[in-house]
Amino acid sequence: MRISRFLQTPFISYEDKNMIYIEVAEWDMCNPYEVNIFVDGELVFGEKIFASSFSAMIPCYDEERVATVSITPFEDTPVDKDFLVVPQKHWEIPLLYSSHEDLGYCAYIEKLHYECYEYLKKAIELCQKHESFKYMIEHYWWLDAFDSYATDNEKALLKKLFAEKKIDLSATHSGVHTSWASSEQLARGMYFGCQEAKEKYGISPKCAFYVDLSGASWSVVNCFAKIGIKYIGILANSFRNSKPNTDIPPLFWWQDLSGKERVLLWNQRSYRQHGLDGIWCDTLRQYPEGSFYFDTTKMLKTERWFSERISQIEPCAYDILPISFYDDRESPTTMLLTVCEEMNKKWKYPKFTMEIPSVFMSRLEEKYGESIPTLRGDISDQWADFATIAPRWMSNKRKATRMLYDIEMLSTIDSVVNRAKYNQKTFRDIYFKLCEFDEHCWATSSKHPQKMHRHNIEKVKRDTVESSVFELEKMRASLCPKADNGEEISIISTIPQGRKNHIYGKKGELVPKELKHQILPNGAVVTEAIELGGVGAIRAKGILPYKESIEIDADFIETDFYKIRVSRQTKRIVSLIDKESGAEYIDSQARFELGQFVYAYAEQKTDPNLSFEIPKKTDFKLYEGEVAFALTQKGYEEQSGAIINTQFVFYKHERTIDVDLSYENATGLIGDFYDRYKKNYFFAFPLKLENPEFYTELHAGEKKEGRDYIPLSANDFSVTQNWVAVDGENRGVAIYTRDMPVFHLGSIKYNRFNRDFSENKAHIYLYASSNRCNNLIYTSVEECQAKYYLSILLYNGKHDDIVPTWSNENDHGLIVSKQSILNGCMMRLDKGNIRLVSLKRSEKESDAVVLRFVETEGKETECGLELFFNPTKAVYARNDEIDLEEITGLKDNIIHFNAQPYSYTTIKVYGDFEI
């Protein structure tokens, strides 16, 4: 016989004895054997054993000792082996019990509100009945549901339990994909859980937990820290874990891009801790209250599980091991409380408790502080490419966020200058809806009953954005009414920096008479560029556009910046040369063409071996007008049934290249019950650069692919705010995307599941569509279509001080209106690297407006802001509008403030304009 394992466990009895596990090999399984354990020559354990593994209790020691384990087989000689016994920690095991509901997944959305109320009411009752019961509300949406039905007494009880730290609130709106939010929405989405929850229930949340998501945008660190959030929780995602697996600590300081802010992040292994779920819930997934049992078998298995888990993380500095154990749509019960009580009856340590995150995360911070490792980088949320399953809805959502910026700004100026009504509740409700749209559960694949899931996905997703856009368009019609032909018009800019851009509109909308214009083949109208000095407007006489694009028979065109050659035989662009550098930008050796539709599909949903189909070309034309050259391509892809239309616009006097892409009749997306990601559409942009380095825009700043990444999950796609860029040696290319924010960079790499990013080709692929959830969305020919608007910029040098400004001008194009509340230049910012993301009225102070900015180039910057009124006071504020220090040196309508690199800066400005 031999001893095959010696494990010192964390379990300490009330007699101060430490439990150890011993496993033996080559036992005859017929006769007992004798075991004696000696420490410093003293016998501390002696028994006869009839098992291949057993536990033994030995004294606890304050310093390392050598334990000699002596095994004497039946009628044989002893076998001795020495093991090191170390002082054992007094472990704490806080168990996190949380609500969890995927919006639109588990119940009809109209019924879910009341279910949330019922579940939270039950949790309140258990907190009152049991002193040690603790519970977390996973997000504000759940609290809002409770608030809709609760009595005044129930609300008072909840407020009391918040104060007693028996119930916690995660400050998130819901389980949102943070990368889908605009820069302003990322902050405004926290107003609900911070501002409104504090006003109603007196709680100031310290944690933001994504209880069913594998990551969050790097920008949440800076944004949330400036709202008072100190702790973030995410969840491991077993389906798309990165390969090779990496040793990322489960607890670390997550530092922002600026290096000045950080939050403490806990990466939960799962929300029903793997291994424990099979022990505690061995006969039922969820036990109704009063039916859970914790017998000797469960006790022994629990002891073994925690012994193994702690042995995996030792040696370490910690003695606190938080464990998540909650489930989808679970009515609160005392199951975890029973586990804690039974374990604590038997064992002095570890100490098992039910605890809320703001308490145990605070304990970890206080106890270990600077010894906790610090990591920097983005953490991919590996379901964020769900955006591709409903491209038309995603396009509408992104349209709403752009409109919100413009309309909220114009409404604020109108309310200050003209004392007009300000629709604060409308803006609040729209942001609430957009956060609902971003909620992570899109009823993945087709679940039963399909009728319910289709109903929910239309309510939670489609209807939220359609109703938001409808409200915003009504407000825009009031603020920016349309003019009749020949009337004076205003050309409005909502960007506080000077700019020179063309107007991009629709046929039938007026354009300035003195500007050259052109109706493009797809019906859009463009003008030559016009210059504006900041937020403001200029007046001009308006006319209906009438100058059509004329088809030309050429295979070579030239603008001020580019030389473009086409092949009419192969119906494609074959050369794109930058005149300044003389460099060719199209990779002629690439598999796909510039702007080409690519149908990528797999036989199995996780198969990394993709097959590719490209369209047959049916038409190719080249047009010219006063402003630009336009190239149109049409094609038909047989396998998917997609009819594809493409339009490139090369402006004669601008570097920007506009691209309109669309497909329709893609009925191949219909079908494939339950399969994920088998059918995918991309548009290819195979560019040619030396030693390419890829960059993706974040809410505040950017990430360099392959460097700024914490590899907790696979790095196969990128979700941008608005642009991606690839720098070469001395030049580069950027793509602005209006409708779809998901890209594959370097290559199409679906199901590769690799954490590494190593690409030597400057190829960019817009991930346009996927058939996941197809039985819920792609159910008719009408649904199987989408449109995408992109802009391409070829630049010399690096992207840093060029692309962010260019992208922002694309995102907030010039507005044409019959009249404008703006007169001349009314607001101007003197630095180009500071992007205004919001101008709004204060939520609480009727005599204040709030401006929020993000820095885009990684530079600490002092800014001068010229306002449209004379302020009486200005302060820096948290991102939830709580005043911080005062800004000094106000002069007339000028404010000077400081902005940190890649950071949010919020200022609140007071004036004599109370409504």
Model-inferred region functions:
Residues 153-171, 221-261:
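Acidic, His- and aromatic-enriched active-site or binding-groove loops in soluble protein domains
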